[in-house]
Amino acid sequence: MSTPGRPGTALVIGEALVDVVIRPDESPTDIPGGSPANVALGLARLGRDAELDCWIGTDARGQAVRKHLEADGVRLTPGSEGAARTSTAEATIGADGAASYVFDLSWEPPYPTRTEGAEPPLLVHTGSIAAILAPGAATVEKVLTDFRATSTVCYDPNARPQLMGEPASARAIVERLVALSDLVK
């Protein structure tokens, strides 16, 4: 495993999970996903040095997520595989094609450790569920705060009202993260 801080590294902090897609008259299909995980994957596919600070288990789903990410060059930060189980987003597709979602989430990512004297990441990206779901949201905010002066900070709110809790509290978190960011999607 590596640690964040290689020159030109993109550090993405956020959820990696399994989308369980259920269609009428078909067996459920597991697909590795998560908005921040997909950003790390896209950066790696573009040839960028990408690290993902996430929270997955060592269960079969977690192993599938790790394998999926590592196949394209994404590295997980130390401690990212500490969850008791890997989170899921179950999408049930109705006969009309509309989806309904049920989330089973655990979000307690480790603070990404750095080697003494290591260069800060060029880019720090977060968003979606990771930025708002306690207790891990506090780690996300600390990472953005700590790297704000040395890295380009990118934030994608990707608002999901059903997961964000009380609107005023969620809005306050989003506003703090926007203020820490150089780029907001």
Q: Where does each model-flagged region fall?
A:
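Short beta-strand/turn micro-motifs composed of small residues
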Residues: 14, 54-56, 157
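Conserved N-terminal subdomain of the carbohydrate kinase-like
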Residues: 20, 48-133, 149, 153
